[in-house]
């Protein structure tokens, strides 16, 4: 099979997400003290926090086994997505882009977790006293990737419905 006709060439997007995330995390760790916060906008801070769990600090209060669990989970899911990219056609641009963003984000957070034992988060959106959970670029890549997959699924469903009519 000609690999250029698969979704694998979209992995450059994974590399961009991966390295952008790690570079920004390095900048935060080098320039901020833990919990230091700089106000950028009336609803947005850059705040250095450590997340020992998953999204929204899920399982953060456990004894440490979750580090290995989340690293393994990221690797397994990434390999599954790589298989999907291999099976996809290059013309499936929206789906391939979504998958690539998810791989880049998952592997960046896994690398962070393997190196530090936690994930560095720093985007802090808030309104008055309410703060959204702090997150990072890898999280953004994963969410945008999932959103693109959802949009693609709706588009595929619309195509099927229009063919049936």
Swiss-Prot record:
GO terms for cellular component: plasma membrane. The chain crosses the membrane at residues 9-29, 65-85, 97-119, 134-154. Its EC number is 3.4.23.36. It is found in: Cell inner membrane. It holds the Pfam family Peptidase_A8. It catalyses: Release of signal peptides from bacterial membrane prolipoproteins. Hydrolyzes -Xaa-Yaa-Zaa-|-(S,diacylglyceryl)Cys-, in which Xaa is hydrophobic (preferably Leu), and Yaa (Ala or Ser) and Zaa (Gly or Ala) have small, neutral side chains. It is an enzyme of class 3 (hydrolase). Pathway: Protein modification; lipoprotein biosynthesis (signal peptide cleavage). The active site is at 121, 139. One of its GO terms (biological process) is proteolysis. This protein specifically catalyzes the removal of signal peptides from prolipoproteins. Belongs to the peptidase A8 family. This is Lipoprotein signal peptidase.
